[in-house]
Curated annotation (Swiss-Prot):
Family note: Belongs to the NAGSA dehydrogenase family. Type 1 subfamily.
Catalysed reaction equations from the record: N-acetyl-L-glutamate 5-semialdehyde + phosphate + NADP(+) = N-acetyl-L-glutamyl 5-phosphate + NADPH + H(+)
Biological role: Catalyzes the NADPH-dependent reduction of N-acetyl-5-glutamyl phosphate to yield N-acetyl-L-glutamate 5-semialdehyde.
EC number: 1.2.1.38
Biological process according to GO: L-arginine biosynthetic process
HAMAP family from the UniProt entry: ArgC_type1
Xref: PANTHER family: N-ACETYL-GAMMA-GLUTAMYL-PHOSPHATE REDUCTASE, CHLOROPLASTIC-RELATED (PTHR32338:SF10), N-ACETYL-GAMMA-GLUTAMYL-PHOSPHATE REDUCTASE, CHLOROPLASTIC-RELATED-RELATED (PTHR32338)
Pfam families: Semialdhyde_dh (PF01118), Semialdhyde_dhC_1 (PF22698)
Broad class of enzyme this protein falls into: oxidoreductase
Name of the featured protein: N-acetyl-gamma-glutamyl-phosphate reductase
Length: 342
């Protein structure tokens, strides 16, 4: 049985990546393509690489346009999904690539996003404990943020097996596409090229409470997270370097064994051989995460590094992976496992 899918926010980076992946999906037919200010224009004006869809006209994002599809992917700015989703049929599979339904803590949502909390949907990171079962029974999916996807995959086995103390430092470098497609002075080429900068320092980034939520759930105890994002001059990709204090008598053998237990059967998470470290180039265009872990014996700390493509595994690919599970399809359906090189 085939399914039809609408993409709301099709002119943006996430919308474009969804369409690139959906074009290769054997069980999903692309339906309505909608946009905000770009409604009425050709898709090819915004995504010239999507040749098969180049002449499709973007329509306004309304409940009427999205109705009648089996799946609706929402690639909208934060805070715009909840009202629209409330007007769609309960049987429609809605996959929200924004932040509206990620956080369970209403106070955390209000603190970091400044609006009324819309609620919580099943969280679309299948690799988390219990996530696949929850996704298989839902018609509403909240796609994780790109930074929490990367950092959570770097750290999850260590917290799941109680190898580290409940505190962690995450420093994650990301390309500029993570900030979206809208023009911003600090993202123009003359500002970004040749420069590396931090932002959202001191726990101010909106993904901070998502890290806390994920890792605390895995560890089954509150985890303190110090997260610093770094903007680097490349279009896409995230490299997260994470460090946490090891519990007594934990060494590298125990750590690697834990990561192997958790990731050997995961189709999209690759634990690299000892001595090989993740790079963003490894995952470019693929729905994969490259992970490596070691022990800093002098500091008594675990060091875990992960790389993903922020638009693929970090958003659009993760959205389709979760949708596959909700539809009863193999979760790898239509998703690339190999990156693009050089």
């Amino acid at each position: 049985m085939g399914y039809t899918a609408a993409v709301a926010g099709a002119s943006g980076y996430v919308g474009g990546e969804l369409l690139r992946l959906l074009l290769a999906h054997p069980d999903i037919e692309i339906g309505a393509l909608t946009a905000g200010g770009n409604a009425g224009t050709r898709l090819g004006e915004h995504h010239p690489h999507l040749t098969p869809l180049a002449d499709r006209i973007l329509t306004e994002t309304t409940p009427e346009t999205l109705a009648g599809h089996d799946i609706v992917f929402l690639a909208l700015p934060h805070g715009h999904s909840a009202a629209l989703a409330a007007q769609l049929d309960a049987d429609t599979l809605i996959v929200d690539c924004g932040a509206d339904f990620r956080l369970a803590d209403a106070a955390a949502w209000q603190k970091f996003y400044g609006s009324e909390h819309a609620g919580t949907w099943p969280y679309g990171l299948p690799e988390l404990p219990g996530a696949r079962a929850a996704l298989a029974q839902t018609r509403r999916i909240a796609v994780p943020g790109c930074y929490p996807t990367c950092g959570t995959l770097a750290l999850m086995p260590a917290f799941a097996e109680q190898l580290v103390e409940p505190e962690v430092v995450v420093v994650a470098a990301s390309g500029t596409s993570g900030a979206g497609k809208a023009a911003k002075p600090h993202l123009i080429a003359s500002e970004v090229m040749g420069s590396v900068s931090v932002y959202g320092v001191g726990g101010a980034h909106r993904h901070n409470p998502e890290f806390v939520q994920n890792l605390s759930a895995v560890a089954e105890t509150p985890v303190r997270v110090s997260f610093t994002p770094v903007l680097v001059p490349m279009p896409r990709g995230i490299l997260a370097t994470c460090s946490a204090p090891l519990k007594p008598a934990i060494g590298l053998d125990e750590v690697r064994a834990a990561y192997q237990r958790h990731y050997d059967a995961e189709p999209f998470v690759h634990l690299l051989p000892e001595g090989q470290w993740p790079t963003t180039a490894m995952t470019l265009g693929a729905n994969t995460a490259a992970v490596q872990v070691t022990v800093d014996e002098a500091a008594g700390r675990l060091v875990a590094v992960a790389a993903i493509d922020n638009l693929t595994k970090g958003t659009a690919g993760g959205a389709i992976q979760s949708a596959n599970l909700a539809l009863g399809l193999p979760e790898t359906t239509g998703l690339p496992m190999t990156g693009v090189a050089p």
